């Protein structure tokens, strides 16, 4: 229940990344080193301000690996024009000042199978 807990515990929570973790230090997408500066953490997750980060830690709109509240995502995506997932990711970039500033991820890598069994509400 770590994903659900992250959203319930923080009204500024915008996105939970299934891709990132505390050891992620190089962005293949941007071919550049990257660094996480956490706001806080618990035994399973880390939170950070995505507005203050670059590359992957500053981009909640990597849709293949992100979890959002349905209400937030519906609000944003309804204001986008797109034909496919790549178009949607690109158009969502216009919301890079969205007021919910917290992203979160698991501290350690978690297998997809474990997320389905353990963390799905």
Language-model regions, residue ranges each:
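Alpha-helical elements of Rossmann-like donor-binding domains used by nucleotide-donor carbohydrate transfer enzymes
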Residues: 2-6, 91-94
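C-terminal catalytic/acceptor-binding lobe
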Residues: 71-121
